[in-house]
Amino acid sequence: QGTANEIAIRGLLHATSPMTVMNVTGPETVSIKKVSEKLGKYLGKKPIFEGEEGNDAYLNDASLAMEIFGYPDVCAETLIRWQAEYILDGGRTLNKPTHFEERKGNY
């Protein structure tokens, strides 16, 4: 969240009218299945998947954000490991569904 918060504040300097669309996400394209498997490995658990993988996916193009703000200081691999450490250390979770199966943008 640190990088996203920093970009949100720094982004005010780049506000335009009419607006410019800018996706703020990591530079890597990551598979939810692969991330789940990696997180499960850190946690000593095997993820359980329901349903079938879709033939399409939502991808965000963060190239404009990367051009303006640079690459984040923390890579996806480190974020996954940190999340596992947080959970293993007894960190609080909200136990809410992820809605990764959502295909119409209604979260």
Identify the meaning behind each predicted range:
Residues 2-64, 100-107:
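Mid/C-terminal beta-alpha module of Rossmann-like enzyme folds, strongest
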Residues 66-76:
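A polyampholytic, Gly/Pro-enriched intrinsically disordered region
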